[in-house]
UniProtKB/Swiss-Prot annotation:
Matching PANTHER family: ADENINE PHOSPHORIBOSYLTRANSFERASE, URACIL PHOSPHORIBOSYLTRANSFERASE, CHLOROPLASTIC
EC nos: 2.4.2.9
Organism of provenance: Corynebacterium jeikeium (strain K411)
Record protein name field: Uracil phosphoribosyltransferase
Alphabetic keyword roster: Allosteric enzyme, Glycosyltransferase, GTP-binding, Magnesium, Nucleotide-binding, Transferase
GO molecular function, one term: magnesium ion binding
Pfam families hit by this protein: UPRTase (PF14681)
């Protein structure tokens, strides 16, 4: 698996806003939107393109477009915040959904939604989730995608923890690339990323009020 930590001043500045505990929901959402677009831009660099003839106002030239736009699959709830940034970069992408919440006692993922095409074989997939902590939720999502034939999966996570990255590598699943803004060193006893940015879903939308 190829791991790309995107090192850029604008990426670092938006990540800093998201990390700051004093950033309110609106500031956090705005920074996440900007950062999401930047990471999707970077993750798209290896997508296959095709060329076609087009007319400008003054001449004929060759244009470029994606041969097969990826399907964007957010792990919701927090991944919902990455849909609009992804579509701003790739407006003709399809969107699927995988819903998972975290059991706050066991720290294990609890799936509650799967809305995906039946056949994902030979279809580029961008699996997006702001946080890669233990890797449990992402690995569960990856196995769901693989069960539908996905063999070209790119994970886009804003903040990744080293234990989660290690779990992804050791699981030997069909992920070709991981794009992230940072790899933080550790998790605390509640399985939150340290230094991290807290609970991305809560900071986007407010506290979750559904009992699992």
């Amino acid at each position: 698996m190829e791991i790309q930590v995107v090192n850029h001043p604008l990426v670092a500045s938006r990540l800093s806003i998201m990390r700051d505990k004093n950033s309110d929901n609106a500031q956090f959402r705005a920074a996440l939107s900007d950062l999401g677009a930047m990471l999707i831009y970077e993750a798209s660099a290896d997508l296959v393109v095709e060329h076609f003839e087009l007319e400008t106002p003054v001449a004929t030239t060759t244009g470029t477009r994606l041969e097969k736009p990826p399907i964007i699959v957010p792990v919701i709830r927090a991944g919902l915040g990455m849909i609009d940034p992804a579509l701003s970069m790739i407006p003709d992408a399809q969107v699927g959904f995988i819903g998972m919440a975290r059991d706050e006692t066991t720290h294990e993922p609890v799936p509650y939604l799967e809305a995906l095409p039946d056949d994902l074989s030979d279809q580029p997939v961008f699996l997006v989730d702001p946080m890669l902590a233990t890797g449990g939720s992402l690995l569960h999502a990856i196995r769901l995608l693989e069960g539908r034939g996905a063999n070209d999966i790119t994970c886009v996570c804003m903040v990744s923890a080293q234990p989660g990255v290690d779990a992804l590598v050791e699981a030997n699943v069909g992920v070709r690339r991981l794009y992230t803004a940072t790899i933080d060193p550790s998790l605390n006893k509640e399985a939150y990323i340290v230094p991290g940015l807290g609970d991305a879903g809560d900071r986007l939308y407010g506290p979750r009020n559904i009992d699992l």
